[in-house]
Regions:
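Bacterial N-terminal signal peptides
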Residues: 9-17
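Bacterial N-terminal signal peptides that target proteins for export
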Residues: 1-10
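Short linear motifs centered on Gly/Pro in flexible linkers and helix caps
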Residues: 3, 20-21
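Low-complexity, acidic/polar, glycine-enriched regions of mature
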Residues: 21-197
Length: 197
C-alpha cells in the first residue's frame, strides 16, 4: 500500500517538475518555412552576384519575453536542397567540391548568446558546415510578436558574411589569385515563426 502511495505521489509531482523547468516568460516559436528564407549571395568571377537559397530547413526560437538576450535559436538546414536556379551549378554545389551533401546532409546554427546591438540584437552562435563549427555574429532585427488566429507570430531578419574556406569549401578551378567563386559569402536570413497550434 505504501509503495502504491509513493507511485501516486510521484505521478502527481512529475508534471509540476516539468512545468517549473520552463519559465512562464519563455515562449517556443517554430519556424514557418513557407514564409521564411535561408539564402546566400556570393560574387562570381568578381563581376556579378549569384544568389541562392536552401529550400528545406527547420528550427525554433525560445523567446524570453522578459529578457530577449536570454533567448535561444536553433536551425537545421538540409544541404541537398540548395537552389540557385541552375541545375548544373546546384549539382556541383551538392558535390564533394562544395557542400558534399551526401556526407554532410545538414548545416546547423545554435546560439551561444544574444547580445544587445546598436540597432536591434546580435545572435552569437556556432555555424557548422561540413562538421566545421565557427562562431558567427549575426545582427538581426526582431519584429513582433503579433497574435493571428490564436497564435503568436514574429519575424527576424539578419545577415552575416563568412569565409567559405573556413568551412573547407575550397574549390577554385582557376588557380591562386583568381576566384571563380569569391571566398566571402553573405548568408541571409528572413525568418517568420509561430507558436505551436
Amino acid at each position: 500500500m505504501r509503495m502504491n502511495r509513493l507511485h501516486v505521489t510521484a505521478a502527481l509531482l512529475l508534471p509540476l517538475l516539468f512545468t517549473a523547468a520552463v519559465p512562464d516568460d519563455v515562449q517556443r516559436f517554430e519556424i514557418d518555412r513557407t514564409h521564411s528564407r535561408v539564402g546566400f549571395a556570393v560574387r562570381h568571377m568578381g563581376v556579378a552576384t549569384v544568389r541562392g537559397e536552401f529550400r528545406d530547413f527547420e528550427g525554433h526560437l525560445l523567446l524570453n519575453t522578459a529578457d530577449i538576450t536570454k533567448s535561444t535559436v536553433s536551425i537545421v538546414i538540409r544541404t541537398a536542397t540548395i537552389d540557385t536556379g541552375n541545375e548544373r551549378r546546384d549539382n556541383h554545389l551538392r558535390s564533394a567540391d562544395f557542400f558534399n551533401a551526401e556526407q554532410y546532409p545538414t548545416i546547423t546554427f545554435e546560439t551561444r548568446r544574444v547580445e544587445q546591438g546598436a540597432e536591434g540584437y546580435v545572435l552569437v552562435g556556432d555555424l557548422t558546415i561540413r562538421d566545421v563549427a565557427k562562431e558567427v555574429h549575426i545582427p538581426f532585427e526582431l519584429n513582433g510578436p503579433i497574435t493571428l488566429d490564436g497564435r503568436q507570430r514574429l519575424g527576424a531578419e539578419g545577415s552575416v558574411q563568412v569565409n567559405r574556406k573556413d568551412f573547407k569549401l575550397m574549390w577554385n578551378n582557376m588557380g591562386e589569385g583568381v576566384n571563380v567563386v569569391s571566398d566571402d559569402v553573405r548568408i541571409e536570413l528572413a525568418i517568420e515563426a509561430a507558436t505551436p497550434r
